């Protein structure tokens, strides 16, 4: 009888694969979308730029004066490139277009780069949040009700024009350019995110541990495709694949053709 495989243990969200909450500062999100932002603007001051373990982008600790009560509210925004401690941040419909300010996306001109874009009005930030990422505004509808943006992946998406966005690029760009160098650095990187590392291949395991394990040499021994209706312990490999192989005209096929030509 086989064991419970790695994919099944991950899905249970137990302590082994659950990311640690200790050391985390706060959720990186906008203010609650209130009357002050919908009709005018509100000013905040960046108290500090902080690092949160497990997050690549730095966070800006912004203090806002509550427009309805005599107190100060503290929010944590994803910092834009060029922001600094003591800088004023303006959020709202009538805010100026400057790096770090938060505006409805239909108020920002075409061609502007933005980050931390909302997908739905008031969801407090969804797209382009990783360090060095940005989205580009392609165009607006005539009534300003819809806006089309290009995401960091190159995909284009249409979102409501009232969704908020930060002008500029997310700070911390070039983070992935620095080499890891040591396995210890890689270990601590994945330990913070609670991802299994190093990742053992299924064909290198015993048959009791994985459907691809076992044999006198490392091979799967049967088609890698598996039905979407298969049991949880069988769902490894190419799950519910519509097709297999290289995509004709794709980047991987072109690289394979170049390698074959160079070998000739």
UniProtKB/Swiss-Prot annotation:
SMART domains: Ribosomal_L2 (SM01383), Ribosomal_L2_C (SM01382). It comes from the Eukaryota. GO terms for biological process: cytoplasmic translation. Keywords: Cytoplasm, Ribonucleoprotein, Ribosomal protein, RNA-binding, rRNA-binding. GO terms for cellular component: cytosolic large ribosomal subunit. It is found in: Cytoplasm. It holds the Pfam family Ribosomal_L2. GO terms for molecular function: rRNA binding; structural constituent of ribosome. Belongs to the universal ribosomal protein uL2 family. NCBIfam families: PRK09612.1. This is Large ribosomal subunit protein uL2. It comes from Tetrahymena thermophila (strain SB210). The gene is RPL8.
